[in-house]
Amino acid sequence: MSEINISAVAVKELREKTGAGMMDCKKALIETSGNFEEAIDFLRKKGLAAAAKKAGRIASEGLTAAKVDGLTGVVIEVNSETDFVARNEQFQDLVKDIANLAVIAKTIDTLKTFKMQSGKSVEEEIIENIATIGENLTLRRMDILEISEGAIGSYVHNEVVPNLGKISVLVGLASNAKDKAKLEALAKQIAVHVAGNNPQSIDDSSLDQALVERERKVFFEKSKEEGKPDNIIAKMVEGRIRKFFSEVVLLQQNFLFEPKLTVAEVIKNAEKELGAEIKIAKFIRYELGEGIEHEEKNFADEVAAITQG
């Protein structure tokens, strides 16, 4: 097979995402004709990459914000070019003001047209701040959480000021429980848990089935390479899938504040205490810069020999 051109950027990014060695990363990219996701799977099958490495670790700067107004909550992300600007009071005030409007706006397109106190639209206000702050600023995304009855818990990790920080989480608990204070406390605890454990779905049925099948295939091929009999492989794969669910499905994760219990068990206990059904209606978790990729400029010397030969 003729060797295709593999860029230094691709090699370094694959190394950062998987923890594998640079030569192994280059080989994986060559073997998969440069397909990044297939290269990750290739390394995992060879036991060269940690399965738990998550996408979206290349960070951008700025702030996320969480805002709750009764039974409505919103999370937004506004990006800047440097962390220095994220600590700028003018920028922080801008993000807070946008978050306050986002609760009413419901969608990001509508939000951009909403008028701020200055009389300018959100979009115009951002452009003006670009000029005064001196960096490119972007209202990147927003998501809204609404419930008809229950409680919304919010948590912001690495706060620079209240409700603004690196990770913002909302958790909506649908319930007709009378003790709203205890329900809100539970929602807050689950929000802290979500910030720390980064679940991918509420339950296994809502988990992306393509992701599940991808994991199943990786586990199967890795077990096969270990030379196990087919009947043993089937049991091993199902065991590993169950473990995978316990790592990425919120209800199956061990609860941060009571590690001997799953989140589902904690909710069951709360239902007994409060005398009402409790359901996680939705959660939102924004981590600053997740999924944003940057051009790398200072690693060419490190990988030149590998990528050229």
Swiss-Prot record:
Keywords: Cytoplasm, Elongation factor, Protein biosynthesis. The keyword Phosphoprotein does not apply. CDD domains: UBA_EF-Ts. Pfam families: EF_TS. It comes from the Bacteria. The keyword Aminoacyl-tRNA synthetase does not apply. InterPro entries: EF-Ts_dimer_sf, Transl_elong_EFTs/EF1B, Transl_elong_EFTs/EF1B_dimer, Transl_elong_Ts_CS, UBA-like_sf. Residues 82-85 are annotated as: Involved in Mg(2+) ion dislocation from EF-Tu. It is found in: Cytoplasm. GO terms for molecular function: translation elongation factor activity. One of its GO terms (cellular component) is cytoplasm. PROSITE patterns: EF_TS_1, EF_TS_2. SUPFAM superfamilies: Elongation factor Ts (EF-Ts), dimerisation domain, UBA-like. HAMAP family: EF_Ts. Associates with the EF-Tu.GDP complex and induces the exchange of GDP to GTP. It remains bound to the aminoacyl-tRNA.EF-Tu.GTP complex up to the GTP hydrolysis stage on the ribosome. Belongs to the EF-Ts family. This is Elongation factor Ts. It comes from Rickettsia africae (strain ESF-5).
